[in-house]
Amino acid sequence: LSKSKLKEKALEKNIFQYKTENRNKEIASVILKRLGVLDDFLIDKLIHDSIDTSKQIAIYSIMKTDRLFFEFMKEVYREKYIMVDPFLSDKDFSIFFQHKSEQSERVAKWVDYTYYKLKQVYIRILFEAYFIKDQDKREINKPLISSEIEDHLINIGDEVYLEAMLGGE
């Protein structure tokens, strides 16, 4: 199926279960964008491998399509792991967003609520993908990524994303 047909089917069957058509369209577009950065090997693994592998591939696709999330993973998650500081604190998020607001006019224009919502979303993504152990203490849980996936990401030149997930190993 083409992307437009997939989107049409998703909206027709309301698979995302949002109340408004606009929200369903938005989610469909985001998902198609994320799927678009995956090659056939990763799509096959996403569909047929373990739920853990699927979630790791989802994190990879989010990093590939969301620069701010990638920078968070690289500058905060990875660094916390390397420094053996295994908890993501509110302060970590605040410092990260402060630095980003100094680097980007767009980010600088955001209101506090935007940062709050982004923090919530990042925590939920990391928790649901088992990258943190719980949503309160936020203890970092280093994922066990299969050597097949690791080798593939290295071979396609995406080791920077692998390093962000694994702490630079």
Where are these regions (language model features)?
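Accessory, usually C-terminal, subdomains that scaffold auxiliary metal cofactors
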Residues: 108-169
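Eukaryotic partner-binding/assembly regions in large regulatory complexes
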Residues: 1-56
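DNA-recognition alpha helix
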Residues: 89-103
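Short capping segments at the starts of secondary-structure elements
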Residues: 1, 85-88
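Helix-boundary capping/turn motifs
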Residues: 2-5, 64-70, 96-100
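Alpha-helix boundary/N-cap detector
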Residues: 19-22, 26, 64, 68, ...
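Positively charged, polyanion-binding regions of nucleic-acid-associated proteins
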Residues: 56-60, 64-86
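Long, low-complexity intrinsically disordered regions
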Residues: 77, 81, 101-110
